[in-house]
């Protein structure tokens, strides 16, 4: 009985310590993302998700999903690509499909080339994307030899409302987000780190 009580007390202490660490990380993440968002114009924030982020550890998933600032950052990346910090957008004409990648240089190479988003901003599917308010979804994507990424989709319905199309896509290095969550850097330093 003594050993069981001791183990229970230890488990409680560990759980409380983990909870405190999670709350601290959540605060740091929001501070960091608030700093980043302060220099942007967020067009809108949609709180609906098609599915929860699937990632380990669970606390990381919960923190990212709970952060309205993270969702705002996704909106910024998707719809307000007027800033040099967003390095590249790829587009395949005619198939209503586009990709936006926030990656380290040379991690992902797209054979379709890299284009300035401003060059395709007037394409019909981009205009429609900005005019509709549909559903966001998260999923986790593992790339062999290239690390792990959070994979973010922007979904919308087609004109006939009969099928969904993944029009834009963001991949962010999981290790970079984890580093942000655990970092003791100032928000300014975190912003510089993320944008690097």
Predicted regions and their residues:
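Juxtamembrane extracytoplasmic/periplasmic/luminal helical "stalk" adjacent to the first N-terminal
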Residues: 1-57
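Alpha-helix boundary/capping residues
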Residues: 13, 25, 47, 56, ...
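Extracytoplasmic/periplasmic helical hairpin
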Residues: 18, 33, 47-73, 182-186, ...
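Generic hydrophobic, aliphatic-rich segments that mediate packing or membrane embedding
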Residues: 18, 36, 70, 94-96, ...
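Second-shell loop/turn segments in exported
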Residues: 25-26, 58-64, 113-119, 167
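Conserved beta-strand cores of small sensory beta-sandwich domains that regulate signal transduction
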Residues: 41, 87, 99, 191-193
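Solvent-exposed, extracytoplasmic
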Residues: 69-81, 165-196
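Extracytoplasmic/periplasmic ligand-binding sensor regions of membrane-associated signaling proteins
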Residues: 79-84, 89-172, 179
């Amino acid at each position: 009985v003594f050993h069981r009580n001791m183990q229970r007390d230890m488990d409680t202490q560990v759980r409380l310590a983990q909870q405190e660490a999670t709350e601290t990380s959540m605060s740091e993440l929001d501070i960091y993302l608030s700093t980043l968002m302060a220099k942007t114009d967020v067009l809108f924030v949609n709180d609906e998700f098609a599915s929860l982020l699937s990632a380990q550890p669970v606390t990381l998933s919960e923190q990212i999903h709970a952060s309205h600032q993270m969702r705002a950052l996704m909106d910024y990346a998707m719809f307000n690509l007027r800033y040099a910090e967003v390095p590249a957008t790829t587009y395949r004409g005619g198939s209503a499909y586009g990709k936006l990648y926030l990656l380290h240089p040379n991690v992902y190479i797209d054979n379709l080339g890299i284009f300035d988003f401003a060059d395709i901003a007037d394409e019909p599917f981009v205009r429609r994307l900005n005019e509709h308010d549909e559903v966001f979804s998260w999923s986790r994507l593992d790339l062999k030899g290239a690390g792990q990424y959070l994979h973010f989709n922007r979904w919308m319905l087609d004109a006939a409302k009969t099928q969904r199309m993944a029009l834009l896509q963001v991949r962010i290095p999981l290790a970079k987000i984890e580093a942000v969550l655990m970092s003791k850097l100032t928000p300014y330093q975190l912003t510089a780190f993320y944008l690097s």
